[in-house]
């Protein structure tokens, strides 16, 4: 895996970087693990925009990635590393000894021919899945469950990882990428290693068109909108006039907006 640069033959190519895709070993996805993916353009069932700056983009098929890793005590062999347009990391196609196939997130150090397994007796090596209670303290982990059996929800993007900071009888302490220290049930599962494609953060798209291919629409500043569209709109675009706010009037710089009391008890130390 590496980054390639482009000759500045146009304004869009100047400074543009991309992947060389040398780690990809299979270019066509496994048909049995594909599902249709209909674009919603970030609208809900009423047609209202629920997430701004999304829409368009290249047509995709969804890859059915196994985040639960609940096929226990059955070894699987990595037969391919593939590209997934729906996420920033690569995915690994694995084949179990009983013939079943599945996609998993490809961590750093996982190669074709390696063997992975979901078992509390498994070795501590990239790709294996264990319960948090069976993982040694200090291990780097990803694809972490927050509820037993629900599947991994934390640390699934390119280069993401968390650290198992401590263990107790019922809960384990996990240090999240944000610096937050969170307690998670020891029966929740996690995969060993750091998610692959760590160079993703170093990619320079180079031009607006590459963002549009990804389904990302332009972000317009509020002070360049009309007064009807944003609290900072109007005034010939000369200045804000007051503190920066969201389109709904909420302060957006240095103002804490978290109001999730349900999970407060699981947070040992807040993120910085």
From Swiss-Prot:
Disulphide-bridged cysteine pairs: none
GO annotation (BP), single: cytoplasmic translation
Chain intervals with Polar residues compositional bias: 262-272
Protein family according to the UniProt entry: Belongs to the universal ribosomal protein uL2 family.
Cellular component per GO, a single term: large ribosomal subunit
Protein name, as recorded: Large ribosomal subunit protein uL2
Subunit details: Part of the 50S ribosomal subunit. Forms a bridge to the 30S subunit in the 70S ribosome.
Region described as Disordered: spans on this chain: 247-272
NCBIfam families noted in UniProt: rplB_bact (TIGR01171)
Function: One of the primary rRNA binding proteins. Required for association of the 30S and 50S subunits to form the 70S ribosome, for tRNA binding and peptide bond formation. It has been suggested to have peptidyltransferase activity; this is somewhat controversial. Makes several contacts with the 16S rRNA in the 70S ribosome.
Name of the encoding gene: rplB
HAMAP family per record: Ribosomal_uL2_B (MF_01320_B)
UniProtKB keywords: Ribonucleoprotein, Ribosomal protein, RNA-binding, rRNA-binding
One Gene Ontology term of the molecular function aspect: transferase activity
Superkingdom classification of source: Bacteria
InterPro entries: NA-bd_OB-fold, Rib_uL2_dom2, Ribosomal_uL2, Ribosomal_uL2_bac/org-type, Ribosomal_uL2_C, Ribosomal_uL2_dom3, Ribosomal_uL2_RNA-bd_dom, Translation_prot_SH3-like_sf
């Amino acid at each position: 895996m590496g980054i390639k640069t482009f000759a500045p033959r146009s304004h869009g190519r100047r400074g543009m970087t991309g992947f060389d895709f040398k780690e990809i070993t299979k270019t066509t996805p496994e048909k049995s693990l594909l599902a249709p993916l209909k674009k919603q353009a970030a609208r809900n069932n009423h047609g209202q925009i629920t997430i701004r700056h999304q829409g368009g983009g290249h047509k995709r098929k969804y890859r059915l990635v196994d985040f639960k890793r609940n096929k226990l005590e059955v070894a699987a062999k990595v037969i391919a590393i593939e590209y997934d347009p729906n996420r920033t990391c690569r995915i690994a196609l694995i084949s179990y000894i009983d013939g079943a196939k599945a996609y998993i997130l490809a961590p750093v150090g996982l190669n074709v021919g390696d063997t992975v397994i979901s078992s509390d007796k498994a070795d501590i090596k990239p790709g294996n899945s264990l319960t948090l209670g069976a993982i040694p303290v200090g291990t780097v982990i990803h694809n972490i469950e927050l509820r037993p059996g629900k599947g991994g929800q934390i640390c699934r993007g390119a280069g993401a990882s968390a650290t198992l900071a401590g263990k107790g009888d019922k809960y384990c302490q996990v240090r999240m990428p944000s610096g937050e220290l969170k307690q998670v049930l020891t029966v929740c599962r996690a995969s060993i290693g750091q998610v692959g494609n760590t160079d993703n953060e170093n990619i320079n798209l180079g031009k607006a068109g590459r963002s549009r291919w990804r389904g990302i629409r332009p972000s317009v500043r509020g002070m360049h909108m009309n007064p009807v569209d944003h609290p900072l709109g109007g005034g010939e675009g000369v200045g804000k006039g007051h503190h920066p706010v969201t389109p709904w009037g909420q302060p957006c710089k240095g103002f804490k907006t978290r109001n999730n009391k349900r999970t407060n008890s699981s947070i040992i130390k807040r993120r910085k």
